[in-house]
């Protein structure tokens, strides 16, 4: 049986505290036909040392560099250029995934002839202990995603051929903008499992000014990038804010 190759794209920037766990959560997958593409974005800590130690032991790991520190969008775009897989997924360097995630997600896609799927996820504390499960819609299309970003970057698995021309824009909330573009191409993403298989590490301090900046970034995506006009941009922004409030308060 042909085993599709899955490319996992991970930007790395000063991630020495949690990088090893994130990498091993990929390499220890029950589905082994993967390539892990690491893009260092100008790290000044021990991240490269950690990566080199792993590369010596596992040839599935590939390391690339940005010329200067350019942010996650540029790093992920290098990963998209270098990826050879039939399917693409992403992981941030301080997060991790369940060991059977890719096997279950890929099998679900192959059995149901799907191009793009997503899963539920959980927030964890800095030690990796689960704090809160976040559930997502069974089916997400472009209009659904406009009402609130239900994806975390590592929850999505998508057929590479279907998004081969897409890249992350160099803006804030670049992942949200990228997935909006994806859903213009593939039309919908389907939930493959109700269990959390992706784990997002969060800090213990939430800064109100960052929430205000995030709100501006989101509105700019609606108004400037999606060109929805003032009224529709305000409408979807209100839905986005409401759904975000509900998600974090449940």
UniProtKB/Swiss-Prot annotation:
Keyword terms of this UniProt record: Glycosyltransferase, Transferase
GO biological process, one term: biosynthetic process
Database matches in InterPro entries: Glyco_trans_2-like, Nucleotide-diphossugar_trans
Coiled coil: none
EC number: 2.4.-.-
Single annotated GO MF: glycosyltransferase activity
Domain of life: Bacteria
Pfam families hit by this protein: Glycos_transf_2 (PF00535)
This protein's record includes keyword Transferase: yes
Assigned protein family: Belongs to the glycosyltransferase 2 family.
Protein name: Uncharacterized glycosyltransferase HI_0868
Organism whose genome encodes this protein: Haemophilus influenzae (strain ATCC 51907 / DSM 11121 / KW20 / Rd)
């Amino acid at each position: 049986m042909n085993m599709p190759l899955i490319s996992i794209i991970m930007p790395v920037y000063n991630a020495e505290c949690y990088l090893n766990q994130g990498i091993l959560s990929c390499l220890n997958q029950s589905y082994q036909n993967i390539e892990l593409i690491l893009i260092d974005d100008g790290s000044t800590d021990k991240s490269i040392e950690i990566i080199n130690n792993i590369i010596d032991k596992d040839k599935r790991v590939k390391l690339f560099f940005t010329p200067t520190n350019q942010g996650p969008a540029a790093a992920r775009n290098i990963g998209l250029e270098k990826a050879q897989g039939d399917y693409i997924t992403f992981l941030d360097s301080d997060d991790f995934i369940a060991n059977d995630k890719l096997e279950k997600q890929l099998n679900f896609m192959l059995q149901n002839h799907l191009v793009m799927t997503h899963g539920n996820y959980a927030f964890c504390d800095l030690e990796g202990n689960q704090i809160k499960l976040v559930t997502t819609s069974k089916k997400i299309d472009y209009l659904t995603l406009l009402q609130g970003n239900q994806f975390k970057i590592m929850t999505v698995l998508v057929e590479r051929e279907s998004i081969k021309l897409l890249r992350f824009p160099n803006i804030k909330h670049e992942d949200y903008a990228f997935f909006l573009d994806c859903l213009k191409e593939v039309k919908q993403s389907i939930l493959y499992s109700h269990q959390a298989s992706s784990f997002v590490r969060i800090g213990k301090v939430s800064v109100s000014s960052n929430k205000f900046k995030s709100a501006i970034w989101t509105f700019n995506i609606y108004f400037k990038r999606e060109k929805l006009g003032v009224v529709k941009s305000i409408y979807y922004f209100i839905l986005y804010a409401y759904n975000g409030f509900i998600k974090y308060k449940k």
